[in-house]
Regions:
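Accessory cap/linker subdomain of secreted extracellular hydrolases
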Residues: 81, 145-252
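Bacterial N-terminal signal peptides
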Residues: 7-18
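Catalytic cores of eukaryotic secretory-pathway lumenal/extracellular enzymes that build
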Residues: 88, 97, 132, 136-140, ...
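Loop/turn elements at helix/coil->beta-strand transitions in domains of secreted/extracellular proteins
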Residues: 43-44, 57-60, 82-85, 124-127, ...
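N-terminal cap/lid segment of alpha/beta-hydrolase-fold proteins
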Residues: 24-56
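C-terminal subdomain of alpha/beta-hydrolase-fold enzymes, centered on the catalytic histidine
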Residues: 233-323
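Cap/lid segment of the alpha/beta-hydrolase catalytic domain
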Residues: 52-120, 162, 166-169, 304-314
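Alpha/beta-hydrolase fold nucleophile elbow
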Residues: 122-135
Length: 323
């Protein structure tokens, strides 16, 4: 995680969760790998847990990711040393978790189930804050519209508000480069999972024409990203998209949030819309009054201070803020 995101995340979540971080910091850290939970429909999801090696109960930072939970080591160690339980979980159908991967589809129910599971861990104090950016921001927003009782706040960084416009399409045109690069990258894990399920190839399969290798020709779109075909089949903003559009469900969100966007981010519009939408339509006073927006100099991959040929200076990272 980029240093500005680490510092920002820990500062903001401390405020949102009202964490009582002990003067004994830094804590020694205990790591538990591949901690499992069951979703309401019986799917096993795997998480890594980083927590203070100390007695007592601590607030939870939860990150649900499609990009491999092992990427959370650095943040997990630092968060736990500062007095948080950090839980990073592979989303359904990704890496170590069970089930089938389909973007956005299960994040609301799986997010709810995971928040409630994390709040009940023996070393948790019952308060859960969700953190992370891009698709990990989407997992927060979709969990928030399901209103899990123990969700205390969210920190979505550089994420969308409508997964049709400004994610898959732009002004009615397919965002082809983003869609194809993103789905192709995600498909690599899907392919790996398929091969691992069928480790023993029949000898005759190995002498088929190269274009006929079964792993690569099962189903449409090679079976690796069939949701991409669904996106193409729904070029207009219809019920397919509305079911998981955050903009359709602002009134269901009941928690404070810090929305972090960047002036040169591909999802800048989403950060602004989420902030304004929940501030106006949030499900309770705490949500409506608890929205904050920070817009930084930077793009989707990180902060400035240099964008192209322009150097905005070392103090530019958090120069723009709104209440």
């Amino acid at each position: 995680m980029h240093p500005y995101r680490l510092s920002l995340t820990l500062t903001v979540v401390a405020l949102v969760l009202a964490a009582n971080v002990s003067a004994r910091e830094p804590y020694e850290v205990t790591i538990e790998n591949d901690v499992t939970m069951k979703t309401r429909d019986g799917i096993t999801l795997h998480a890594d847990v980083y927590r203070p090696k100390a007695d007592g109960k601590f607030p939870v930072l939860l990150e649900r990711t499609p990009y491999d939970k092992h990427m959370g080591v650095s943040f997990g160690l630092q968060a736990a040393a500062r007095g948080y339980v950090y839980v990073i979980q592979d989303c359904r159908g990704r890496h170590t978790s069970g089930g089938d991967w389909y973007p956005f589809k299960y994040e609301s129910q799986d997010g709810y189930d995971t928040v409630e599971w994390a709040a009940a861990l023996p070393y948790a104090n019952g308060k859960v804050g969700m953190v992370g950016g891009s698709y990990v921001g989407a997992t927060q927003m979709l969990a928030a519209i399901s209103a899990p009782p123990h969700l205390a706040g969210i920190l979505p960084i550089a994420t969308g508000s409508n997964y049709h416009e400004n994610w898959t399409y732009q002004g009615g045109a397919l965002t082809q480069l983003f869609d194809q690069v993103w789905t192709s990258g995600l498909a690599m894990d899907t392919l790996d999972r398929r091969v691992r399920k069928e480790p023993h190839r029949k000898p005759w399969q190995m002498v088929l024409p190269l274009a006929g290798f079964p792993v690569l020709v099962t189903g449409t779109s090679t079976g690796l990203a069939d949701y991409y075909l669904d996106w193409l089949a729904h070029p207009r903003y219809d019920d397919y998209w509305k079911q998981w559009s955050i903009e359709e469900h602002f009134s269901k969100i009941q928690v404070p949030a810090i929305h972090v966007g960047a002036w040169y981010d591909i999802f800048q519009d989403g950060s602004l819309r989420n902030y304004l939408g929940i501030k106006a339509q949030g499900g309770n006073e705490a949500a409506r009054n608890g929205q904050r927006l920070w817009v930084i100099v930077g793009g989707h991959a990180g902060a400035g201070p240099k964008i192209g040929d322009i150097d905005f200076g070392k103090d530019s990272v958090l120069v723009s803020a709104a209440k």
